[in-house]
């Protein structure tokens, strides 16, 4: 069997993580979080198509913001009482930088600590 180098046809980059001990006033501020996502998309050279957000009440209440970008998506989900957030940035193509978006979001949400994961989701086709 020939193991010739494979050709990446789709460049998929996925950066995601968990943010701990974020300020409650940030975790619950839907407008602020929307603005953070919009700016993160710009900084990462993404083409913003639409932003949706909503605030959920109750003990596990929080805010969700999802940006659809031409290259894929950015999502933030917060839990106010737990001072916790998850962040997901996925891009397709070579021109966008999901790391830049993720790092900007972390800077603006001000966690005391966070974890970050990366998955290369490039489709590799044998030649």
From Swiss-Prot:
Q: In which pathway does it act?
A: Amine and polyamine biosynthesis; agmatine biosynthesis; agmatine from L-arginine: step 1/1
EC main group: lyase
Q: Which GO terms describe its cellular component?
A: cytosol
Name the site position(s) for Cleavage (non-hydrolytic).
71-72
Purpose of the protein: Specifically catalyzes the decarboxylation of L-arginine to agmatine. Has no S-adenosylmethionine decarboxylase (AdoMetDC) activity.
Which terms under GO biological process does the entry name? arginine catabolic process; polyamine biosynthetic process
The UniProt GO MF terms for this protein read:
arginine decarboxylase activity
**Cofactor binding note of this UniProt entry:** Binds 1 pyruvoyl group covalently per subunit.
Tell me which UniProt keywords the record has, alphabetically. Autocatalytic cleavage, Decarboxylase, Lyase, Polyamine biosynthesis, Pyruvate, Schiff base, Zymogen
EC numbers: 4.1.1.19
Q: Where are residues bearing Pyruvic acid (Ser) located in the sequence?
A: 72
Tell me if Zinc is a UniProt keyword of this record: no
Taxonomic classification? Archaea, Thermoproteota, Thermoprotei, Desulfurococcales, Desulfurococcaceae
Cofactor list: pyruvate
Q: Where is the active site?
A: 72 (schiff-base intermediate with substrate), 77 (proton acceptor), 92 (proton donor)
Q: How is it modified after translation?
A: Is synthesized initially as an inactive proenzyme. Formation of the active enzyme involves a self-maturation process in which the active site pyruvoyl group is generated from an internal serine residue via an autocatalytic post-translational modification. Two non-identical subunits are generated from the proenzyme in this reaction, and the pyruvate is formed at the N-terminus of the alpha chain, which is derived from the carboxyl end of the proenzyme.
Family to which the UniProt record says this protein belongs: Belongs to the prokaryotic AdoMetDC family. Type 1 subfamily.
* Alphabetized InterPro entries for the sequence: AdoMetDC_fam_prok (IPR003826), ArgDC (IPR027549), S-AdoMet_deCO2ase_core (IPR016067), S-AdoMet_deCOase_pro-enz (IPR017716)
State how it assembles: Heterooctamer of four alpha and four beta chains arranged as a tetramer of alpha/beta heterodimers.
| Name of the protein this chain belongs to | Arginine decarboxylase proenzyme
Reaction(s) this enzyme catalyzes, per UniProt = L-arginine + H(+) = agmatine + CO2
């Amino acid at each position: 069997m020939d193991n010739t180098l494979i050709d990446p046809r789709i460049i998929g980059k996925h950066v995601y993580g968990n943010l701990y001990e974020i300020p409650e006033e940030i975790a619950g501020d839907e407008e602020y979080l929307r603005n953070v996502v919009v700016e993160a998309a710009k900084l990462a050279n993404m083409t913003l198509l639409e932003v949706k957000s909503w605030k959920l009440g109750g003990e596990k209440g929080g805010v969700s913001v999802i940006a659809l970008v031409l290259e894929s998506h950015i999502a933030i989900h917060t839990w106010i009482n737990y001072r916790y957030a998850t962040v997901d940035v996925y891009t397709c193509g070579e021109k966008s930088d999901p790391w830049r978006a993720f790092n900007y979001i972390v800077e603006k949400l001000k966690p005391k600590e966070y974890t970050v994961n990366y998955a290369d989701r490039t489709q590799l086709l044998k030649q």
